[in-house]
Amino acid sequence: MEREIDLQEVSDGRLYTSTDMVKLGCNDCSGCSECCRVVEDTIILDPYDISQLCQALETDFQGLLAGGRIELSVVEGVILPHLKLKEGRGGCTFLDSAGRCRIHDYRPGFCRMFPMGRIYENGDFRYFLQVHECPYPNKTQIKLKKWLGIPELARYEQFVKDWHFFLKDAERKLSEAENEEIPKRINLFLLQQFFQKPYGDAFYEAFYERLSEAGAVL
């Protein structure tokens, strides 16, 4: 999810890359699951996240919806999936009674990154540390790449950039639509193209093939 922020108010004033050391270490969140309990409907999922969740739960996109794991919402005119919260008291549905994540190895990029955020500019992005988000005391230095724990991180970060700026283009075209039917058709196409069709084992190859097809359509 995008936010308008003042970096000086929410961060330590630095911008990071994945090779930098950042004060994030928290002993694997031992005794704490605060960020998973107070979360709101703001964990927007990208195609990689959906692919990972489908693998973890051995299901497909429709299964995630029917199983109450995700919901759809409109973000800047684009319909996108987000994690669904527990009914009533809220919190992540993947948090177990011991305060641990049931899908930790497959968790979404937002969860992996927290309490880091991303700032996009000039076709690229860098990370920033949200200093008021994580209450865990006495954090230690850790390399951001290790904190993220994502295989083939360079490919993943390129995907993140390409997906972000593709969505920006889609948002612009949706906002310029001359009638209500055009956004409906585009959103249905995007859901089918990037989320409903399984990715299999070769996620990046499949994603970029679909991205090329979508670029030609839009």
Regions found by a protein language model. Give the residues of each.
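Short loop/turn segments that flank or connect secondary-structure elements
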Residues: 1-218
